[in-house]
């Protein structure tokens, strides 16, 4: 790489790492690198977003979907600051992302120059690798190390580079590192396998809690569950690891979860945690033996007191553990859970078919599921929309579900669909958003238009921050500042050069989704829905008490008496 500029070296190395596009916004502290990207535009495409937050969210979503490094680029100062939300999303969900941040000219660093901030200090908490590049010669080595670390530690790597360094010639050979990361298979230890197998063999009511660590072990998970006669509950980021209608599947756990999952957790005599660090202790059983499988030893016992642990690669570990356990012939617990889940499906599917005005979000999601391709990518935003998609979109084994699960940042839906369409263009990319989440990033709909991405954006529009309203009410408070000024999102889409479709009636849903999903341009389907409360699968006494307090306050202060369906509430309570 001698006699090449640092910018040239960077573009070549990114290509060697398999990167074919970079998200960001051009500007004065990265102009020299932008020039190199212009030269390499046929191999390394620059995707111009309208906000750096969207660039980082898209890079994170791409990494979650493909497992490959996502790359975003910003100028110094405000541009770098804007990256943080998306980078924290990548950190929280363990997605490998590289952020390249421009910096003021090297001769001005440390002099409080225009747009100068202390980038290393700012990125310190979010990054697993964080370096400021001080010479052209060091940049190739640092870039390789940054990407390798992002992969190995499943997190964010940041390189801060002054613009003049991109144009500086590299005066020496060779490069002492190579653009390669070899992922090893961590084999489980025999003594760990024996101990875990003993607990599983002795259990009469084992239950599996599967996390996103099982995404590369779907087949192994089902084979293990069948032999252990264990029902499977999944965390939100693991949605799709098990097909929703599989007989072992009990749905999600927590606020977005199902009643069968909650009740099975209460009844189990062994908790088997696979590839998850589920944080909500209140939804896990009390004083129950637990075993945990994870590739990261620091995760074992982090959230729940485990009796035995297994540190290994998910697929390899499950295959070996399955060989060690006995086939469980007593399947009464599994059969009872399957029966309870079927009752749950029967109950919630009534909401999907009931004719109502305004529309229910459950109806919208059910019709979308019927219209979506068998290998569609669902990029789901944060809010009540997360609840409806987690419960009512019944995924198969070929579909993917991406979401900001741990940081839970609103506005992730549209960037995720953009990333999905760019990285896997042969698949349908569908963003499912609330009006609150979409409005946070709606300025980037023109990005999809500009790059001719045939994404579909479905907006569940209740003119409200529904999850926040519900949380306020459950605390016993009257909802305040949750109503949103409505926007005609279909008209907005048309003004951006996309197709806009407004839906207000049930009979309009299927034609709207068919048109959107078969279009060769971005389409926004703006669906007006009622303000349906996202009742948890199992209502706790504390939630019922808080909501009762809200109803009394609302009656005496506003002369309004509002509550969800009594029949539905009683079924969730008892």
Swiss-Prot record:
Question: Induction of this protein: by what?
Answer: Transcriptionally regulated by SigB.
Residues that bind thiamine diphosphate, according to the entry? 52
SUPFAM superfamilies tied to this protein: DHS-like NAD/FAD-binding domain, Thiamin diphosphate-binding fold (THDP-binding)
What cofactors are annotated for this protein? Mg(2+); thiamine diphosphate
Where are the coiled-coil regions?
Answer: 28-55
Q: Which GO terms describe its molecular function?
A: catalytic activity; magnesium ion binding; thiamine pyrophosphate binding
Q: Which UniProt keywords apply?
A: Coiled coil, FAD, Flavoprotein, Magnesium, Metal-binding, Thiamine pyrophosphate
Residues that bind FAD, according to the entry? 256-277, 294-313
Q: How is the cofactor bound?
A: Binds 1 Mg(2+) ion per subunit. Binds 1 thiamine pyrophosphate per subunit.
Which of this chain's residues are annotated to bind Mg(2+)?
435, 462
- The membrane spanning regions, by residue number, are none
Where is the segment annotated Thiamine pyrophosphate binding?
Answer: 384-464
Matches recorded under PANTHER family: PYRUVATE DEHYDROGENASE [UBIQUINONE]
What's the family?
Belongs to the TPP enzyme family.
Output this protein's name: Putative thiamine pyrophosphate-containing protein YdaP
According to its UniProt entry, this protein's organism is Bacillus subtilis (strain 168)
Annotated gene: ydaP
């Amino acid at each position: 790489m001698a006699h090449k500029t640092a910018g040239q070296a960077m573009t070549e190395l990114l290509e060697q790492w398999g990167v074919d596009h970079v998200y960001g916004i051009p500007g004065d502290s990265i102009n020299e690198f932008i020039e190199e990207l212009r030269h390499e535009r046929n191999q390394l495409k620059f995707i111009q977003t309208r906000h750096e937050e969207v660039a980082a969210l898209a890079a994170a979503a791409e990494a979650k979907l493909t497992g490959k490094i996502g790359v975003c680029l910003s100028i110094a100062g405000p541009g770098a600051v804007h990256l943080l939300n998306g980078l924290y999303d990548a950190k929280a969900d363990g997605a490998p992302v590289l952020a390249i941040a421009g910096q003021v000219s090297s001769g001005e660093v440390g002099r409080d120059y225009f747009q100068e901030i202390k980038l290393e200090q700012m990125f310190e908490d979010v990054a697993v690798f964080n370096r400021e590049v001080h010479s052209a010669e060091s940049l190739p080595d640092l870039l390789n190390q940054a990407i390798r670390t992002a992969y190995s530690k499943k997190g964010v790597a940041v390189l801060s580079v002054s613009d003049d360094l991109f144009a500086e010639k590299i005066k020496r050979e060779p490069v002492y590192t190579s653009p390669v990361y070899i992922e090893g298979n961590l084999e489980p230890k025999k003594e760990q396998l024996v101990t875990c197998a003993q607990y599983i063999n002795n259990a009469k009511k084992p239950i599996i809690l599967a996390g996103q660590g099982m995404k590369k072990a779907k087949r192994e998970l089902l084979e293990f569950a069948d032999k252990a006669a264990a029902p499977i509950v999944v965390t939100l980021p693991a949605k799709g690891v098990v097909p929703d209608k599989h007989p072992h599947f009990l749905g999600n756990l927590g606020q977005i979860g199902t009643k069968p999952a909650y009740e099975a957790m209460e009844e189990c005599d062994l908790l088997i945690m696979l590839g998850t660090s589920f944080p909500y202790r209140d939804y896990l059983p009390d004083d129950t033996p637990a075993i945990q499988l994870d590739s990261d030893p620091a995760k074992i016992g982090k959230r729940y007191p485990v009796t035995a642990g297994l540190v290994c690669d998910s697929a390899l570990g499950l295959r070996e553990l399955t060989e060690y356990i006995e086939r469980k012939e007593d399947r009464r617990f599994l059969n009872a859970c399957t029966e309870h889940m079927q009752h749950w499906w029967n109950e919630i599917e009534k909401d999907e078919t009931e004719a109502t005005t305004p529309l229910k979000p459950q109806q919208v999601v059910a019709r979308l599921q019927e219209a979506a391709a068998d290998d569609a990518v669902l990029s789901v935003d944060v809010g009540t929309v997360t609840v409806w998609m987690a419960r009512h979109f019944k995924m198969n084994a070929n579909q993917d579900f991406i979401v900001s699960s741990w940081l839970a940042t609103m506005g992730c839906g549209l960037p995720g669909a953009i990333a999905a369409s760019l990285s896997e263009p042969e698949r349908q990319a569908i963003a499912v958003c609330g009006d609150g989440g979409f409005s946070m990033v709606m300025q980037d709909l023109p990005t999809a238009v500009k790059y001719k991405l045939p994404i579909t954006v479905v907006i569940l529009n209740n003119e409200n921050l529904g999850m926040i309203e519900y949380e306020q009410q459950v605390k016993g408070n009257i909802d305040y500042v949750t109503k949103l000024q409505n926007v005609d999102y279909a008209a907005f889409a048309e003004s951006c050069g996309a197709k806009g479709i407004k839906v207000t009636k049930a009979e309009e849903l299927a034609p709207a989704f068919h048109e959107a999903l078969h279009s060769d341009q971005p389409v926004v389907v703006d669906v007006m829905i009622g303000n349906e409360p996202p009742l948890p699968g199992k209502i706790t006494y504390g939630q019922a008490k808080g909501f009762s307090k809200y109803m009394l306050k609302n009656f005496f202060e506003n002369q309004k008496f509002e509550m969800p369906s009594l029949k539905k509430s009683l079924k969730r309570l008892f």
